From Swiss-Prot:
NAD(+) binds at residues 273-287. It comes from the Bacteria. It comes from Chromobacterium violaceum (strain ATCC 12472 / DSM 30191 / JCM 1249 / CCUG 213 / NBRC 12614 / NCIMB 9131 / NCTC 9757 / MK). NAD-binding protein involved in the addition of a carboxymethylaminomethyl (cmnm) group at the wobble position (U34) of certain tRNAs, forming tRNA-cmnm(5)s(2)U34. GO terms for cellular component: cytosol. FAD binds at G13, G14, G15, H16, A17, G18. This is tRNA uridine 5-carboxymethylaminomethyl modification enzyme MnmG. SMART domains: GIDA_assoc_3. It is found in: Cytoplasm.
């Protein structure tokens, strides 16, 4: 049957990408349908019970700045919060939280059910409805046809998913869930560039069978960081510690004894796994000289005894898993609640996508998450929000949007995917960004919330709070720049000397004094003349003022570097350009450009094998008027 209501946007899949996509499209006012194989698993954390980390926390903050759900759900469900790299510069500081799986999933479910313009429906999707070169709907397993202007596909590991434990394997999207095999076969028929990747998860442990007294306790930070710009510390539930132990030589010997039954080493698994989250057997094989590896026991929640042993992801046979776990200090009597496993699944070459995450081959079809070759909840959520937002814009026949590399880690993520592709699951690191001094966690809202408001994904309450913060930061910076301290006019010169480490000998602005190393804003405000006329600032405002003042010189230099670049990002390449007509390009370069069809000269310049000389030839070609290149 054809469902009686048509939609602007259909989102297929209810994981981290799908939920953000559906919420974003609905926030814009688009009639949105979220199709999931099981409403009970919306927002489920399929692997580790944590959100954030280096690079990943930056993405979560950006999703939050654009009105997304992940950071807020983490504040509601987070049972341990830490700031990583706290002693380093603000560019690489990152928030990480352990989450109670049940609380996190419940928070996401509540947001979905209470979001205007969003309809939920439980049915697996077996096919896409395509007319010509455009998607116009989705067809479920029981034959219901839903029509829509756009479809966002966020299938995670479900497309032709196969689960491996030792040499035993079976089809599945994750443990306990069926794979989307029919949809996987249908997508392969569309001649989209497809490959196989794999990921894995460790065995889960019953905490009652663990001796924590011989392990190192790892508490969260006090006071606890708050993840969301809309979050409050009062939202946080009871906090729990993690625990650290280590593998040993006996563990490694046990694991090596199972290599002959490992699906990874026997060639049973075709897919490539994540480089930065390797299985324990892969670590022992690659780093044979190491006699131990860290294992973090992470609590799964407040109402369960289940623990996630981060660091021992495995697809080895269960007898090897059990023996290896019980060889680890503190886990000699451990009871495994769920076996570890690997899962391999289909992904599609992201070089077949536009920057909006719309497929180049099929109009109105957007991909987000692991289907694009990424790994991680955070990377999925960021793509989901962008795809949902752009699906909404497409449905309204408006121009697509994607941040640039110098504007957001989301821009770095998308640009890396669509220009370089992936040969292994892609995860975000701060080192991937050239302009990371500007792309900090603390200023994600200042970078993106104004654009989010224009696009319709940021609500009134968030916008009002953002405006108050932005205005308070600017007002205090102006006061610091306009306020002068003269040594002869200080009531207590020693007070300022204690803050600065030495007395001043001439007149300085407060801005000049705050620029000095080891002079915190709050300490400077203990000097009466500095605090005169100062407003009472919230911590996040004071932090932003201090960072902007201290790093403005470095940021200015980075901005100059940006300005010196040729405006390659603004020069669009027509979709119908024939690179075979560009004089001077090698056959290899012509082939790569014709295959990948970059949207801008900037994208073209980052394709592997495209030289600066080739970019110069393209610019000459465009300037001669062979094609009509429009400035973005």
């Amino acid at each position: 049957m054809i469902y009686p209501t048509s939609f602007d946007v259909i989102v297929v899949g209810g994981g981290h990408a799908g939920t953000e996509a559906a919420l974003a499209a609905a926030r814009m006012g688009c009639a949105t349908l979220l199709l999931t194989h099981n409403i009970e698993t919306l927002g489920q954390m399929s692997c580790n019970p944590s959100i954030g980390g280096i690079g990943k926390g930056h993405l979560v903050k950006e999703v939050d700045a654009l009105g997304g759900a992940m950071a807020l759900a983490t504040d509601i469900g987070g049972i341990q919060f830490r700031t990583l790299n706290a002693s380093k510069g603000p560019a690489v500081r990152a928030t990480r939280a352990q989450a109670d799986r049940i609380l996190y999933k419940a928070a996401i479910r509540e947001m979905l059910e209470n979001q205007p313009n969003l309809t939920l429906f439980q049915q697996p999707v077996d096919d896409l409805l395509i007319e010509g070169d455009r998607v116009v709907g989705a067809i479920t397993a029981i034959g219901i046809t839903f029509r829509a202007k756009t479809v966002v596909l966020t299938a995670g590991t479900f497309l032709s998913g196969k689960i491996h434990v030792g040499l035993e394997n079976y089809t599945g999207g994750r443990a306990g869930d069926q794979a989307a095999s029919t949809l996987g076969e249908r997508l392969r028929e569309l001649n989209l560039p497809v490959g196989r990747l794999k990921t894995g998860t460790p065995p889960r442990i019953d905490g009652r069978s663990v001796d924590f007294s011989v392990m190192e306790e790892q508490p969260g930070d006090t006071p606890e960081p708050v993840f969301s710009y809309r979050g409050k510390r009062a939202m946080h539930p009871k906090q729990l510690p993690c625990w650290i132990t280590h593998t040993n030589e006996r563990t490694h010997d046990i694991i090596r004894s199972g290599f002959d039954r490992s699906p990874m080493f026997t060639g049973v698994i075709e897919g490539v796994g994540p480089r930065y989250c390797p299985s324990i057997e892969d670590k022992i094989n690659r780093f044979a000289d190491k006699d131990s590896h860290q294992v973090f026991l992470e609590p799964e929640g407040l109402t369960t005894h289940e623990f996630y042993p981060n660091g021992i992801s495995t697809s080895l046979p269960f007898d090897i898993q059990l023996a290896a776990v019980r060889s680890i200090r503190g886990m000699e009597n451990a009871h495994i609640l769920r076996p570890g496993y690997a899962i391999e699944y289909d992904y599609f070459d992201p070089r077949g996508l536009k920057a909006s995450l719309e497929t180049k081959a099929i109009q109105g079809l957007f991909f987000a998450g692991q289907i694009n070759g990424t790994t991680g909840y955070e990377e999925a959520a960021a793509q989901g929000l962008l795809a949902g937002l752009n699906a909404g814009l497409f449905a309204r026949e408006q121009e697509a949007w994607c941040p640039r590399r110098d504007e957001a880690y989301l821009g770095v993520l998308v640009d890396d995917l669509i220009t370089k592709g992936v040969s292994e699951p892609y995860r975000m690191f701060t080192s991937r960004a050239e302009f990371r001094l500007q792309l900090r966690e603390d200023n994600a809202d200042l970078r993106l919330t104004e654009m989010g408001r224009k696009l319709g994904v940021v609500g009134d309450e968030q916008w009002d709070a953002f405006c108050r913060k932005r205005d308070a930061v600017e007002a205090e910076k102006a006061r610091l720049q306009a306020t002068w301290l003269h040594p002869s006019k200080l009531a207590d010169p020693a007070a300022l000397a204690r803050v600065l480490g030495k007395p001043i000998e001439r007149e300085y602005t407060l801005q000049d004094l705050l620029k000095r190393p080891n002079v915190p804003y709050r300490e400077l405000m203990t000097v009466p003349e500095a605090a005169d006329g100062a407003p009472e600032l919230a911590d996040e405002v004071a932090e932003q003022v201090e960072i902007q003042v201290k790093y403005q010189g470095y940021i200015n230099r980075q901005n100059e570097e940006l300005a010196r670049r040729d405006n390659l990002e603004d020069i669009r390449l027509p979709g119908d350009i024939d690179y075979g007509l560009v004089k001077g390009l090698s056959k290899e370069v012509q082939q790569k450009l014709n295959q990948q069809r970059p949207e801008t000269l900037g994208q073209a310049s980052r394709i592997q094998g495209i030289t600066p000389a080739a970019v110069a030839l393209l610019m000459v070609h465009l300037r001669r008027g062979f094609t009509d290149a429009k400035t973005a």
